[in-house]
Amino acid sequence: MVSFCGVAACLLTVAGHLAQAQFPPKPEGVTVLESKFGSGARITYKEPGLCETTEGVKSYAGYVHLPPGTLRDFGVEQDYPINTFFWFFEARKDPENAPLGIWMNGGPGSSSMFGMMTENGPCFVNADSNSTRLNPHSWNNEVNMLYIDQPVQVGLSYDTLANFTRNLVTDEITKLKPGEPIPEQNATFLVGTYASRNMNTTAHGTRHAAMALWHFAQVWFQEFPGYHPRNNKISIATESYGGRYGPAFTAFFEEQNQKIKNGTWKGHEGTMHVLHLDTLMIVNGCIDRLVQWPAYPQMAYNNTYSIEAVNASIHAGMLDALYRDGGCRDKINHCRSLSSVFDPENLGINSTVNDVCKDAETFCSNDVRDPYLKFSGRNYYDIGQLDPSPFPAPFYMAWLNQPHVQAALGVPLNWTQSNDVVSTAFRAIGDYPRPGWLENLAYLLENGIKVSLVYGDRDYACNWFGGELSSLGINYTDTHEFHNAGYAGIQINSSYIGGQVRQYGNLSFARVYEAGHEVPSYQPETALQIFHRSLFNKDIATGTKDTSSRMDGGKFYGTSGPADSFGFKNKPPPQHVHFCHILDTSTCTKEQIQSVENGTAAVRSWIIVDSNSTSLFPEVVGSGEPTPTPMPGGATTLSAHGFLYGVTLWAVIVVAVIELAM
């Protein structure tokens, strides 16, 4: 998982005149469709012809534009536009009869382009950050896939565009006043265009985000011309903070379906479309804080890889912080008791509730989870790897801001991986520890919607122990049967067992072997098989048994085997060969970052040239150690197509000055 890059850590030298030549082009060739319902909404899109290069398979990228006031039908004041970016890929096989899957990354504030480009999308970006190769395990093999950047201001989605200055040393970002001259850029001072970075013009919590996404879906599924299925089933797959997104969004959609069907929804004509929900898949999701917090001390100290990431004393301190009077557990219970009375819909409308819930999250994170980060030296998303880890490779970060990619997508701003303003808006209302997520999952199951929980067993961030506890914490009609189901091996092919699964009917919990936070990146075939089996009503264990109808005796299909899977042990993996990609400083050591700042680093295509990178990517960085040429102000250039080119585009990645459009 790529973290938000600290700007000072990303300090690079920029030649201002070169950077200005690389600004994203004004979008051209964009199709504009005004809503037929007169709501003021519209769709803009292009056929980019990128990433999915399989002959005959179409893709479309664009925006659903929602005007101010769209959310008023939910009693929410919204005085800003919501321009939500999407990228849709037809299924490679029989798209007319294929179901549709929606993919969203978490954060909150993370772009779904991360999942698309490194996990389950049609292509991967090569080490040159300028070309792609097809992914044979893409989730659009048999499913139409829709990737969405949400909530507004995430990734390529925006409210309004504005010009900013950015000081790379102090990390200060200042909005330029209208008519103010564009300042001259230098090595540590840049200008550019972003979404507004106004915390008041993004979603304040998961429930608020669900409302905006539902309106997006109403427009897209009724009016987007590139989607004409005979199969109207819609599934949602999400990851990480998607442990909240998935339950809340899907439950909200189903609640709206019920209101439309029974006539209690009084929205305008364009908001009467029933979304035929089929499956919710959560990949390494942080679902319920109260249930999952005990899993962090266990994962750090007693996991199936026999890795003691913290010592006994630190482990005891983590447990004490969790269970002592006034500790993490008590703070969350206090948050939930207040929110259930004063803010039952988790809209952030009560400042006392917000503060109490925010305080609970801060305490629990610092004292229960973060000792692992402070003392282990291991990766947050893969306990088997030491920090820094270069996996999944961040080559896509530069590719998404290549001028030809921006032009093909028709986007009016630069892409960013994570938005700290969005994350802050969620944290400000204490969205993390609030209640309701497991209840949402129970509601979905009671309404016939499948729930598939998938967890890589090397992740710490939202680890599988917590995922298992969440699965057992869902209280619904078949809870007893699910608890009594044993674990069965996940048969991927004739020679490979990909993990263990407990399943009864529409609910499954899968532990995937040898996988970190982003399961499809680590185990692409296993992830694809689980995805297909979930959507096509097959058992997760073998893919051969029907799960949609009752068997003899009136029971649904259920797995049998051991009551838990802890007894299935793993060996720690070898370490990845390390390389530093300067657009993602989480892949770099402190010394490497300093070498970029002080001008001693040699860099090609955003990769620091050393013995590791020359062995991994000789066609990109060269096969031997180069002789760097100093550049004024710091970094070094290898050639006109080496570091200098990288610096020019990084200016575009961080910021850009463009004509404000759409």
From Swiss-Prot:
Record: active site: 240, 459, 517
Disulfide bonds: 51-123, 328-364, 335-357
UniProt keyword list: Carboxypeptidase, Cell membrane, Disulfide bond, Glycoprotein, GPI-anchor, Hydrolase, Lipoprotein, Membrane, Protease, Signal, Virulence
Keyword Disulfide bond in record: yes
Residue numbers binding substrate: 462, 518
Membrane topology listed for this record: Lipid-anchor; GPI-anchor
GO biological process, alphabetically ordered: proteolysis
GO molecular function: serine-type carboxypeptidase activity
Subcellular location per the Swiss-Prot or TrEMBL entry: Cell membrane
Highest taxon, organism lineage: Eukaryota
Signal peptide: 1-21
Family to which the UniProt record says this protein belongs: Belongs to the peptidase S10 family.
PANTHER family: CARBOXYPEPTIDASE (PTHR11802:SF189), SERINE PROTEASE FAMILY S10 SERINE CARBOXYPEPTIDASE (PTHR11802)
Function: Extracellular serine carboxypeptidase that contributes to pathogenicity.
Protein name as it appears in the record: Carboxypeptidase S1 homolog B
Organism: Trichophyton rubrum (Athlete's foot fungus)
